[in-house]
Every structure is written in structure tokens, then in C-alpha cells.
A protein has these predicted regions:
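Transmembrane alpha-helices and membrane-interface helical segments
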Residues: 28-35, 72-80, 124-128, 167-185
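Hydrophobic alpha-helical membrane-interfacial segments at the cytosolic entry of transmembrane helices
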Residues: 54, 80-100, 193-197
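Extracytoplasmic
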Residues: 199-238
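Membrane-interface helix-loop-helix junctions at transmembrane boundaries of multi-pass membrane enzymes
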Residues: 82-88, 126-142, 178-189
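Membrane-embedded helix bundles of polyisoprenyl
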Residues: 1-37, 47-77, 97
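Signature aromatic-anchored transmembrane alpha helix within multi-pass, membrane-resident enzymes
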Residues: 182-203
């Protein structure tokens, strides 16, 4: 929980407010699928009716968070857990398709190879360090790693936004795997080093984002006369 809180706070410091909102709905959708009460296990339609709107709200808040819900849906689909896959996957796809039809958009966000290194590395760490019985986590990390490579190779609107999933939840998966690793073995030490690296990565990236996204005081001061002149001539009226 603390590892997740650290990732979410770092995301807020970086200024990704709408993505944070979308992540809240995304977590709700995923929790609905995986934490559905056992006594209602046969009520699959009820589960879908709860998970799908949350997945849709996640995508409406932030298409990037909707994309990450889709990655979990793919992992479930590959395990032949089709009801959960459809519940999580169809709503984000419908929201994106409707948005593209109503509000056509174009352009791409560049993503250099350097931006892929750490997300790929931590996708590999999660795949390697979590227990082999955690199939959904391992498949999701593998699908995510492949997605990072595809986004780097193929220019799209996603770009470096794909890195956010590992920045939020790689630490959570690694911390969760720690109690299942034999202490003071090579794997345990490697896992601890990976966790320390994750904390350093997220801490540095958040501080860097905060520094570079804060408007300079001189910019605000020098812009004030121009804004005042525009207001006096009624520029806001067109």
C-alpha cells in the first residue's frame, strides 16, 4: 500500500492530475474483477455491470489510464478468463472509438529509446521476481514490455505516456514479491537493489518534473502587461 501511495504521490507531484483521476477509476474497475465477493461468484453480469462503467470513466478521465486497464484485459484474455477481459476491455475501446469519431485528432508524441530503458527493465524485473503462480501479474508485465517496444517503434499519440504504468505499480509488485522470496539469497538481494533503484528513479523523475513545470517568476511578471493590454481591448471577445 505504501509503495502504491508513493507512486501515486509522485504522479501528483509531476502534475498528472487527470491521469491520477483516471487511475482511481481504473483501480476500482480492476478491484471489481479481482475482489468480487465469493458469495456472488455466479453473478458475472453484475460484476461486468460494475466494472465496465468504472473502466469507461477511467478512459474518459485519461485515455492513458484506460490503456492500462486494457493491458490487464489482454492478460485476462490470454488466460481464457473471458468475462473479466470483456468487462475491462470493451468499455475503454468504445470510449476511445467514440472520442475519435466525435473529435478527430492527429499528431504523435515522440519517444526516444532512452525513455524505454527503465520501463522495459522494470517490466522484466516484475516478470522475473514475482512468484510463478502470479500469472496475471507476469502476463501483464510481459504485455506491457512488448507495448513499450511497439510504442517506441511505431509513432503514435501514446508516446512516452506508456512509461507511467511501471512508474506507478512496478514498485508495488516488487514489494509484494519480497515476502515470497527466500531472505539473503541472490534473488532477494537483487530484488532489494531493484526496489532501491525504483525509489531513486521515481524520486528523481518527480523532482525533475516539478522543477521544469513550475512557471518562472520572471515569465509571469513580464507577461502581465501584455495580458492587461489584451483585456483592455476586449481580446477575449474575439
Amino acid at each position: 500500500s505504501l509503495a502504491g501511495l508513493f507512486g501515486l504521490l509522485a504522479n501528483a507531484v509531476s502534475g498528472r492530475v487527470t491521469f491520477g483521476l483516471g487511475t482511481m477509476f481504473a483501480l476500482g474497475a480492476v478491484a471489481t474483477v479481482f475482489c468480487w465477493p465469493h458469495r456472488w461468484r455466479h453473478e458475472r453480469w453484475a460484476k461486468a455491470l460494475c466494472a465496465a462503467p468504472l473502466a469507461a470513466l477511467s478512459t474518459m478521465s485519461s485515455p492513458v489510464s484506460g490503456l492500462f486497464v486494457g493491458l490487464v484485459a489482454v492478460a485476462l484474455f490470454l488466460q481464457k478468463r473471458r468475462p473479466g477481459a470483456w468487462a475491462l476491455g470493451l468499455a475503454p475501446a468504445a470510449v476511445v472509438a467514440l472520442s475519435a469519431w466525435l473529435f478527430p485528432f492527429s499528431g504523435t508524441q515522440p519517444m526516444g529509446f532512452g525513455s524505454t530503458v527503465l520501463p522495459l527493465l522494470y517490466a522484466g524485473f516484475v516478470f522475473a521476481f514475482v512468484p510463478s503462480t502470479w500469472k496475471t501479474v507476469r502476463i501483464t508485465s510481459a504485455v506491457y514490455g512488448l507495448s513499450v517496444l511497439l510504442v517506441w517503434v511505431i509513432s503514435s499519440q501514446i508516446g512516452s505516456n506508456i512509461t507511467r504504468l511501471s512508474m506507478l505499480f512496478a514498485g508495488v509488485a516488487l514489494v509484494a514479491a519480497l515476502p515470497f522470496t527466500v531472505p539473503r539469497t541472490r534473488k532477494w538481494y537483487a530484488l532489494v537493489v531493484a526496489l532501491a533503484g525504483f525509489v531513486g528513479w521515481i524520486g528523481f523523475k518527480s523532482a525533475d518534473d516539478a522543477v521544469h513545470t513550475t512557471p518562472a517568476a520572471s515569465w509571469a511578471r513580464e507577461l502581465a502587461p501584455l495580458v492587461n493590454e489584451l483585456q483592455e481591448v476586449g481580446a477575449e471577445k474575439g
